[in-house]
């Protein structure tokens, strides 16, 4: 008899179908990200998926596992997708290959494959790249309305593989907006500018021209929010983690903002910038590395939300979703141990 590994679900849908549903739910966010930041994200995702399938197939072959059966569970594709859309669109090709190899081979297969990994593989790959190559990992283009140079599919492909567009511009030149000023993400801009300006002056910059948050980034987050609500509606994920994540992050941001509005970002900026919605619905809800009890999921999600706020405000990185998820993964055994539902009729006794 062969027993399948986790993740297990309460319904009869296979792991393959659930993974595919999560991939499809990412589409609204990917469309928004492609519109505002170019085709580079699609190229990164394709490179990551090819690398993930080849790497997982090779490791499964070495482990004498059924290659095609394991590859068809779509878990490698989902890991690749999450990593691909997390990287700057025009990051060098070798970075996505390296990050994907680390995610699949080290963070997933080294622990025994799907259902055995204690950490989210995509976030392990992301953090390895962020620590090793911080400059490349923060080289985001300005959103479409602020771009000084339009970057099409061909130029995106050339920049990823050669470092230059067909006209000879590199990534640093492409980062310069229409106003001649090098652009950064809203969270990065806010955090850096706070050293010399009050918040109300910072928010006058064009990058903060969105209704909810940063220009472009608010639509990316809304896209992933739509996909996340689809997953909740289809019962592919539990509500506990994303709700507690967003409430904790929004609560911390609201309290600090009300106390010192000139020193802290507003709750809306935190909720609709960076990887907030992607993290809440697609990353933190990983059924393998997240808590498995109802109360545990609430604690797990809230812990991630608090850690994201702490890292964004006091840490060395503008966005803290990846670090927060991995730190929370460490606490899962402890959380699950103390939040196990009590068996009906069970009474604690003494020897």
UniProtKB/Swiss-Prot annotation:
GO terms for cellular component: plasma membrane. It is a multi-pass membrane protein. Keywords: Cell inner membrane, Cell membrane, Electron transport, Flavoprotein, FMN, Membrane, Phosphoprotein, Translocase, Transmembrane, Transmembrane helix, Transport. Pfam families: NQR2_RnfD_RnfE. Its EC number is 7.-.-.-. Its main location: membrane. The modification FMN phosphoryl threonine is found at residue 185. It is an enzyme of class 7 (translocase). It is found in: Cell inner membrane. Its cofactor is FMN. Disulfide bonds: none annotated. The chain crosses the membrane at residues 18-38, 40-60, 87-107, 121-141, 211-231, 241-261, 264-284, 298-318, 320-340. InterPro entries: NqrB/RnfD, RnfD_bac. One of its GO terms (biological process) is transmembrane transport. Part of a membrane-bound complex that couples electron transfer with translocation of ions across the membrane. The complex is composed of six subunits: RnfA, RnfB, RnfC, RnfD, RnfE and RnfG. Belongs to the NqrB/RnfD family. PANTHER family: ELECTRON TRANSPORT COMPLEX PROTEIN RNFD, ION-TRANSLOCATING OXIDOREDUCTASE COMPLEX SUBUNIT D. This is Ion-translocating oxidoreductase complex subunit D.
């Amino acid at each position: 008899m062969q027993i399948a590994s986790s993740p297990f679900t309460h319904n009869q849908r296979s792991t393959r179908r659930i993974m595919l549903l999560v991939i499809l739910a990412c589409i609204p966010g990917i469309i928004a990200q492609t519109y505002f930041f170019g085709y580079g994200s699609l190229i990164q995702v394709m490179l990551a998926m090819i690398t993930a399938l080849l790497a997982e197939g090779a490791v499964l072959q070495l482990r004498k596992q059924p290659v095609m059966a394991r590859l068809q569970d779509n878990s490698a594709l989902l890991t690749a997708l999450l990593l691909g859309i997390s990287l700057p669109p025009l990051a060098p090709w070798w970075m996505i290959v390296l990050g994907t190899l680390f995610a699949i081979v080290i963070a997933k297969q080294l622990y025994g494959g799907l259902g055995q990994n204690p950490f989210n593989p995509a976030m392990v790959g992301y953090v390895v790249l962020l620590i090793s190559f911080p400059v490349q990992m923060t080289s985001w283009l300005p959103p479409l309305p602020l771009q000084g140079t339009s970057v099409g599919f061909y130029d995106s492909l050339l920049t990823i593989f050669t470092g230059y567009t067909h006209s000879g511009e590199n990534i640093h030149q492409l980062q310069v907006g229409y106003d001649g000023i090098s652009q950064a993400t809203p969270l990065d801009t806010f955090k850096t500018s706070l050293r010399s300006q009050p918040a109300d002056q910072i928010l006058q910059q064009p990058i903060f021209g969105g209704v909810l948050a940063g220009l472009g980034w608010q639509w990316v987050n809304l896209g992933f929010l739509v996909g996340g609500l689809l997953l909740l509606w289809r019962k592919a994920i539990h509500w506990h983690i994303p709700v507690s994540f967003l409430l904790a992050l929004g609560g911390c941001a609201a309290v600090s903002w009300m106390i010192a509005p000139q020193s802290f970002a507003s709750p809306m900026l935190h909720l609709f910038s960076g990887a907030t919605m992607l993290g809440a619905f697609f990353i933190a809800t990983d059924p393998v590395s997240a808590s498995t009890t109802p109360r545990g999921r609430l604690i797990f999600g809230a812990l991630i939300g608090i850690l994201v706020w702490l890292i964004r405000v006091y840490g060395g990185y503008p966005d803290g979703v990846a670090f927060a998820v991995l730190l929370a993964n460490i606490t899962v055994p402890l959380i699950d141990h103390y939040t196990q539902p009590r068996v009906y009729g069970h009474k604690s006794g003494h020897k």
